[in-house]
Amino acid sequence: MSKIIAFDEEARRGLERGMNQLADAVKVTLGPKGRNVVLEKKWGAPTITNDGVSIAKEIELEDPYEKIGAELVKEVAKKTDDVAGDGTTTATVLAQALVREGLRNVAAGANPMGLKRGIEKAVEAVTEQLLGAAKEVTTKEQIAATAGISAGDASIGELIAEALDKVGKEGVITVEESNTFGLELELTEGMRFDKGYISPYFVTDAERQETELEDPYILILNSKISTVKDLLPLLEKVMQSGKPLVIVAEDVEGEALATLVVNKIRGTFKSVAVKAPGFGDRRKAMLGDIAILTGGQVISEEVGLKLDTADLDLLGRARKVVVTKDETTIVEGAGDADAIAGRVGQIRAEIERSDSDYDREKLQERLAKLAGGVAVIKAGAATEVELKERKHRIEDAVRNAKAAVEEGIVAGGGVALIQAGVLAFEKLELVGDEATGANIVKVAIEAPLKQIAINAGLEGGVVAEKVRNLPTGHGLNAATGEYVDLLGAGINDPVKVTRSALQNAASIAALFLTTEAVIADKPEKAAAAPAGGDGGMGGMDF
């Protein structure tokens, strides 16, 4: 495919036009009085959202240079969403302000590389101030306030705070669609995985169709069990102990399964067989997790352990195991706390190293099952469009709350950036183009607050000037139009969100300013429609 090339000012202005179109569509959603954006879908009902990254993803521009500019800003929103789960609109507004101010200075003759260095130093100084000013999140109310602001709904904030309180910061909170109207929270006690009993004959509670075994031994096996002779020596030892047995294996079939079922029906011996969760390497890892949690070992020929020679000390223990037809829950495994902590550290290191979103998600689930627990928020709404929008808001708010617990909170509403900037720029001593670069940041960090004010029907410049001179932590409550102590009023943002938004916006802005040429695909002319005539069927009716 042939290419087109633009140089110098033409290249940068083309990128800026694309960025402005995307940013202008996104920034109307910022703040408590921000509006929604309707996104048309190729199939199904349109989506209504106020989430910056969702809007950005939908924007495809026709002009090749504008398209590249928009794609670069999409990257800001996506990266901020990946890291912090929120702040995508703030990041987009900051990127637009940094680029606008930066290009003005480049056009006036400033050296782009000098500006880039100045921007980087200023952002580092502001980030340092933000982290220094962050308040640790210690109460449920603080989490509820943060999540409530992100979701735009205090009741969602309270539910998320309740969920985090139960499962801990390592726990997993998932959001599911509900058939009923409103919100509900469902908590999982212990480790749960999505495999149920192999045979319904194992059921101990016919009414609830589940098997519940108290204080069982747990056999964890990385292979199939088909013949009873392999299992018999271990079965006899477990029967002598008087405890029930849970078998987690690749599969249990044939006479081995028949023997277990017959003994269960006769009341001789209580047991349940469950297929191991996952596939391939992930199955191995999850069996290892179950072994660590219950204080047992995975019986596998790879490590020289065989079923027919296994002893009771290789089996795991738990206070209770509950098995339904679809899932298994292990409550209070008897694993060593240090071993579990070591395994958690190992999984966390894998998450850091992984560059696949899918792998990261699966590792996060494993981490939650070991370290915390799982909470499910079920959301319902009147229409499918509203339900999707609500579910998305809750997912964002969950990540926002976790970010708050991780690094702490700062005053919300765009105020923290301005007030951190006031302190940072007092200490910053730069000259020449680097000083100009720092000044670009000084002007740009006011953009989120100004946009929040504009969306609330106020004059952005007047509000920014007033906030700059207020005591630290005081600012505009855009919902009421009053100037208050924001942290005291529960208006806060996770510092991770604010910091990520600024750092990612500055990174893309520096790319814009130092661009001297843009090479894009030449737009293809649409092929003319074939004319109808005698040779074809163009003139015929069907």
Swiss-Prot record:
It is an enzyme of class 5 (isomerase). Its EC number is 5.6.1.7. One of its GO terms (cellular component) is cytoplasm. GO terms for biological process: protein refolding. The keyword Nuclease does not apply. ATP binds at T29, L30, G31, P32, D86, G87, T88, T89, T90, G413, N477, A478, A479, D493. Pfam families: Cpn60_TCP1. It is found in: Cytoplasm. Keywords: ATP-binding, Chaperone, Cytoplasm, Isomerase, Nucleotide-binding. PANTHER family: 60 KDA HEAT SHOCK PROTEIN, MITOCHONDRIAL. Belongs to the chaperonin (HSP60) family. Together with its co-chaperonin GroES, plays an essential role in assisting protein folding. The GroEL-GroES system forms a nano-cage that allows encapsulation of the non-native substrate proteins and provides a physical environment optimized to promote and accelerate protein folding. This is Chaperonin GroEL 2. It comes from Kineococcus radiotolerans (strain ATCC BAA-149 / DSM 14245 / SRS30216). The gene is groEL2.
